[in-house]
């Protein structure tokens, strides 16, 4: 055993007051619904005097920590403490692929005040303090997800051993819900791995893989899964060992000067990223520093207080609403029918989108994929997409080369339709050309199986027109991905009037296997995401034509909470691609979607954005990849999270001369934001009224995951409820007077304002709202 892989007994400053003792039966399994007769925590003592505490919440696929489990843990520890010959404890999970996925955040629903939530955190701190102060070594044997409260429990143990397995990840993701770790995580983690690494983990919510966890000192050993328990038992038998020293860099940063510099830099970078919209990030910094500066008692007290206050914040409520919305959506099939089994998938087109779709199908769904492209180079490009993605995992030691080869063997390609007779669903990702897509439908009906579904990745063409000449129109559907496919979580599933229920259910099932969140939307121009994005983009362009500088427009919307400004978005998407959908929207939905004349002038000047190095901003190295149009891309599709990392680019000032505009900031950020976002909100309500989306929940998910609507606002409909329909109607009518009829509030919004209605039930907890009437 390496001297660096050690066990340490932690001194804790948290109160160790015992909690009440329930009657428990330690000889039976656990149950989330009946914790008295079926405890989630059981203790078995081996002949060698090592106690094994098993966590198994019966009835749940994964373990989550619930408030009622506190009494069970206290009882287990008291029973173990009473064993005079006990040499150590090992905590393991009874689930096959999960340690503890986190705390059950529905507990927050029972908290009506910040004080209630603070008490909840203090209870968690007290229980974990008992583990930390236990008189014999306690070792966590971790396999599978060890997140949130699960990692906080592991941190309270004296040693952590984890399995070398892709399913094993460790992290503190509470910040993603507008919270901070409330059971000691902000205090124990910095002392274990160093303040710099701890802040990075807690502020980002990132998940750490086993080898990385070992390197940073988060775990003491990484072993194959089949010997995990044996190694943990031996570690417990080894007794108390000295704690491994922190690396010199972390020791330097823990000193007065290093610490002051580190926190100053971290706070500056955090505010630059969050723009002040995510108070949890700032509270995390404060709480971690307080614990380091003033010691454990002050740190734990600050952690509990901050947890309580954040739990009651509107930002956390909005983020938790999104969490529960996506969780409920994942349980739905999108149809009353049963999905057909999917064994093989076909992809038409080997471009950016086709390659991405093949990638997630093979690597996430684990399904064989057959790619068809007219050019062998297209097939090679698609194969390279997945090879490169898997190669990154191999280089970071998150995957073995043999596994890379195995997953690559799931993807094959051809310039003809050989192999498509065995395919269950085909995803088409070719040019946005109606006649071409109709020909693809005919080809699949000829060369595919009788049951093969044809799913088009179109971003603008009506699915009914794509299916117009089909012999089996009930098996034609839209499946709209967003780029980059392996990063963007949303897909729109678009049935037309003849699409069968089985086709809908099967398509949703495929999307879910690919790791996607799927919303079912109606077959009308722009579907949902691009339809609400179009007026937002148009209005930003009008602000530019009014003389507002490009950077002022973009900064206003980024400050509001979007990941990237609308002008930068146009450059990233491709100005030609972004404007292509506008005529279709105007034709089907009316003149309010008419693009400002500036787009025609810009396109005639040869400006397409980043891809050809000419757009609203200057680019020294334009990207060499092909036009997004070729791959079925759309304005929302290029809304990659990587934009957050882009450095500020200089504006191409020549565009002002081209447009005949003299730039001068005069509107103000509030005016710009209101003009752009009010149109988006109004259009979202129209989509709900026209049944483009099934309910407000789907509309919120689509906007946040599809175009980056500020998550801390919860989505357009949560945001509308927070503003009040009457205030929104009032604002829109004022904008009508100032800028024209395009701001006319839709009738549903007017009616809701008159009747003082909301989109979500007023008295319902966000945890309880899984669906709402449209």
Swiss-Prot record:
> Which UniProt keywords are listed?
Cytoplasm, Fatty acid metabolism, Isomerase, Lipid degradation, Lipid metabolism, Lyase, Multifunctional enzyme, NAD, Oxidoreductase
What Pfam families does the record tag this protein with? 3HCDH (PF00725), 3HCDH_N (PF02737), ECH_1 (PF00378)
Q: Where is this site: Important for catalytic activity?
A: 152, 174
Query: SUPFAM superfamilies this protein is in?
Result: 6-phosphogluconate dehydrogenase C-terminal domain-like (SSF48179), ClpP/crotonase (SSF52096), NAD(P)-binding Rossmann-fold domains (SSF51735)
| GO CC terms, sorted | cytoplasm
Q: What is its main location?
A: cytoplasm
What GO MF terms are annotated?
3-hydroxybutyryl-CoA epimerase activity; enoyl-CoA hydratase activity; long-chain-3-hydroxyacyl-CoA dehydrogenase activity; NAD+ binding
Q: Where is the composition biased (Polar residues)?
A: 8-31, 620-637
Which biological process terms from the Gene Ontology are attached to this UniProt entry? fatty acid beta-oxidation
For this entry, the protein name equals Fatty acid oxidation complex subunit alpha
CDD domains under this entry?
Answer: crotonase-like
Protein role: Catalyzes the formation of a hydroxyacyl-CoA by addition of water on enoyl-CoA. Also exhibits 3-hydroxyacyl-CoA epimerase and 3-hydroxyacyl-CoA dehydrogenase activities.
């Amino acid at each position: 055993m390496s001297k660096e892989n050690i066990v340490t007994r932690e001194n804790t400053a948290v109160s160790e007051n015992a909690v009440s003792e329930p009657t428990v039966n330690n000889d039976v399994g656990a149950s989330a619904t009946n914790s008295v007769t079926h405890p989630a925590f059981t203790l078995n003592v081996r002949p060698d005097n090592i106690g094994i505490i098993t966590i198994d919440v019966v009835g749940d696929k994964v373990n989550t920590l619930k408030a009622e489990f506190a009494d069970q843990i206290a009882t287990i520890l008291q029973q173990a403490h009473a064993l005079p010959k006990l040499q150590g404890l090992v905590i393991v999970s009874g689930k096959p692929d999960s340690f503890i996925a986190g705390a059950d955040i529905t507990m927050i629903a029972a908290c009506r005040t910040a004080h209630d939530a603070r008490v909840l955190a203090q209870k968690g701190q007290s229980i974990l303090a008992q583990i930390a102060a236990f008189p014999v070594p306690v070792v966590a044997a971790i396999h599978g997800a060890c997140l949130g409260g699960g990692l906080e429990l592991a941190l309270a143990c004296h040693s952590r051993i984890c399995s070398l397995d892709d399913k094993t990840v460790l992290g503190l993701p509470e910040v993603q819900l507008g919270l901070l770790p409330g059971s000691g995580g902000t205090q124990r983690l910095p002392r274990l791995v160093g303040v710099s690494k701890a802040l990075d983990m807690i502020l980002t919510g990132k998940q750490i893989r086993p080898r990385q966890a070992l390197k940073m000192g988060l775990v003491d050993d990484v072993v194959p899964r089949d010997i995990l328990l044996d190694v943990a038992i031996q570690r417990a038998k080894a007794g108390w060992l000295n704690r491994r020293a922190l690396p010199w860099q972390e020791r330097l940063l823990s000193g007065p000067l290093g610490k002051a510099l580190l926190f100053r830099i971290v706070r500056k970078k955090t505010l630059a990223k969050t723009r002040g919209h995510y108070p949890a990030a700032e509270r995390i910094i404060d709480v971690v520093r307080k614990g380091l500066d003033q010691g454990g008692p002050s740190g734990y007290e600050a952690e509990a207080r901050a947890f309580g206050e954040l739990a009651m914040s509107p930002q956390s409520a909005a983020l938790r609403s999104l969490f529960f919305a996506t969780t409920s959506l994942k349980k739905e099939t999108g149809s009353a029918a049963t999905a057909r089994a999917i064994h093989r998938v076909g992809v038409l087109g080997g471009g950016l989108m086709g390659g991405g779709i093949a990638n997630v199908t093979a690597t996430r769904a684990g399904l064989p994929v057959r790619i068809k492209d007219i050019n062998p180079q297209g097939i090679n490009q698609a194969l390279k997409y997945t090879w490169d993605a898997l190669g990154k995992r191999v280089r970071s030691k998150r995957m073995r080369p043999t596994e890379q080869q195995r997953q690559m063997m799931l993807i094959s390609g051809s310039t003809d339709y050989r192999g498509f007779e065995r395919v269950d669903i085909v995803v088409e990702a070719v040019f946005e050309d109606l006649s071409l897509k109709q020909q693809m439908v005919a080809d699949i009906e000829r060369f595919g199986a009788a049951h093969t579904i044809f799913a088009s990745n179109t971003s603008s063409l009506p699915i009914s027109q794509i299916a117009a000449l089909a012999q089996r129109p009930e098996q034609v559907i839209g499946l709209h991905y967003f780029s980059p496919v392996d990063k963007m979580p949303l897909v729109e599933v678009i049935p037309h009037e003849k699409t069968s229920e089985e086709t809908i259910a099967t398509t949703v099932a495929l999307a879910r296997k690919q790791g996607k969140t799927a919303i079912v939307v109606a077959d009308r121009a722009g579907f949902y995401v691009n339809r609400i994005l179009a007026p937002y983009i148009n209005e930003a362009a009008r602000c530019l034509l009014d003389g507002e500088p490009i950077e002022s427009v973009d900064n206003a919307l980024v400050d509001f909470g979007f990941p990237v400004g609308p002008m930068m978005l146009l450059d990233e998407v491709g100005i030609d691609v972004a404007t292509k959908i506008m005529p279709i929207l105007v034709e089907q939905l009316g003149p309010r979607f008419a693009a400002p004349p500036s787009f025609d002038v810009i396109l005639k000047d040869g400006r397409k954005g980043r891809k050809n190095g000419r757009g609203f901003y200057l680019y020294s190295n334009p990207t060499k990849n092909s036009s997004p149009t070729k791959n079925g891309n759309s304005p929302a599709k290029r809304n990659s999270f990587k934009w957050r990392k882009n450095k500020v680019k200089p504006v191409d000032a020549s565009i002002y001369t081209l447009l005949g505009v003299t730039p001068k900031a005069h509107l103000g950020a509030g005016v710009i934001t209101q003009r752009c976002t009010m149109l988006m909100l109004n259009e979202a309500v129209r989509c709900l009224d026209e049944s483009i989306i099934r309910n407000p929940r789907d509309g919120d998910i689509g906007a946040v995951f599809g175009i980056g609507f500020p998550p801390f606002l919860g989505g357009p409909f949560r945001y509308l409820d927070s503003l009040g329909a009457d205030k929104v109607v009032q604002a829109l009518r004022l904008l009508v007077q100032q800028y024209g009829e395009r701001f006319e509030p839709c009738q549903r919004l007017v009616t809701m304002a008159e009747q003082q209605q909301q989109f979500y039930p007023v008295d319902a907890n966000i945890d309880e709202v899984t669906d709402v009437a449209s």
